[in-house]
Structure formats: structure tokens, C-alpha cells
């Protein structure tokens, strides 16, 4: 099961939270969901050069708050916050009659972030760099940041081959079945002359102990 399912979805409610933090009734749920999807696609496309790792969306009655996790916060913020204001104005086409708030969160170690690693490998594949070299170099850089393990997979017509295949590489340990294991997951697609190549990255950051268990142990000590 752990090998097949998205590691984020499997751990939601256990050690991971939701990327969309809002509640809506049946009447508004679909509209909000479509709105969220449009916002995510637009922000990823508009700020691709900033290295967007994750976008969290929080909603209140007349307010939409975006938490944008990025490797290059300066690119988004701009001179004197001009970049954020420009982004807010552009987002009004998706969010009607609501106040948009944008919070920028810096990703400290971009080379060990699964989503940014996947996008980096995809970008190298589009530049016709060997998929083996791209995967191995990205993994080696990530391991230097103190992570416990990393696994990468590339699927498609690798190297322009007639038959599509999947190739995996991994270093360290990746306990996908263990729910308390903090697994970061990223996916990206490379558009090559032979077609699309899918890139998946799993990063193991160590175990997360449930807070109740930790509190109980502290009380007994």
C-alpha cells in the first residue's frame, strides 16, 4: 500500500496537515475547490522561477490567505513588496469580492525538498541531460543536507527509447509503509521531444513521534 499511494495523502491526520484549510457547505464546496485549483496552477506558472514547493490555502468568510513555500522569497516579494501587490491584483480574477492575503514562507534547504528536487530533475531532462546523471547528482546533493534517505523515479521514453520504462534510484532508507515516518513527496513532468517524462521524488526526514506519546513519556520521567 505504501509503495502505491501518495505519501502525503496517506499521512494526513496522522503527522501531516491539509494543504487546503477551509470548510464549505455543499452549495459552495465545488466552487471553492475549482477556485483553489485555478489559484495553485496560476501561482505555480507565474512564479515558476521562484521555486514553489507548496501552496496552502486558508479561507474565512471574506478572506483568502495563501501560504506560499518558496526557495527564493526575494523573487516573489520584489522591491518594497511590489511583487506581492502585483500578485494580489492578478489573483482578483479568480477570487471575487474577497480580500487576498499572501504569506511567504522560505524553504531553508531547497536541495532536500522533494517537490523542488523533482522540478530540478525535470528541468535537466528538458535540457537533454542524461536522466541517470540528473537523478544521481540531485540525490547526492540532498543527502549532504542530513536527510535519512531519498528515492527518485523517472518514467517515460527515457533517452528517446522506443519503449517507455521506469527507472528507480535510491540512497539511505525510505520506509513508505511506516505512518510516523516523515516522507516528503514531489512530482514533476518534463516535456521532451520524445514526449512527457514523469519524475517522482521521495525524501525521508526521520520519524515524527505523536505528541501524546511524547507528553506521556515526559510525565512519567
Curated annotation (Swiss-Prot):
Keyword Lipoprotein among UniProt keywords: no
CDD domains, alphabetized: KH-II_30S_S3
GO molecular function: mRNA binding; rRNA binding; structural constituent of ribosome
SMART domains, sorted: KH
Entry keyword set: Ribonucleoprotein, Ribosomal protein, RNA-binding, rRNA-binding
Domain KH type-2 positions: 39-108
Entry similarity comment: Belongs to the universal ribosomal protein uS3 family.
The protein's name: Small ribosomal subunit protein uS3
Gene3D superfamilies, per the entry: 3.30.300.20, Ribosomal protein S3, C-terminal domain
GO biological process: translation
Keyword Transcription regulation: no
Disulphide-bonded residues: none
Name of the gene this protein is made from: rpsC
Described function: Binds the lower part of the 30S subunit head. Binds mRNA in the 70S ribosome, positioning it for translation.
GO annotations of cellular component type: cytosolic small ribosomal subunit
PANTHER family named in the record: 30S/40S RIBOSOMAL PROTEIN S3 (PTHR11760), SMALL RIBOSOMAL SUBUNIT PROTEIN US3C (PTHR11760:SF19)
Subunit structure of this chain's protein: Part of the 30S ribosomal subunit. Forms a tight complex with proteins S10 and S14.
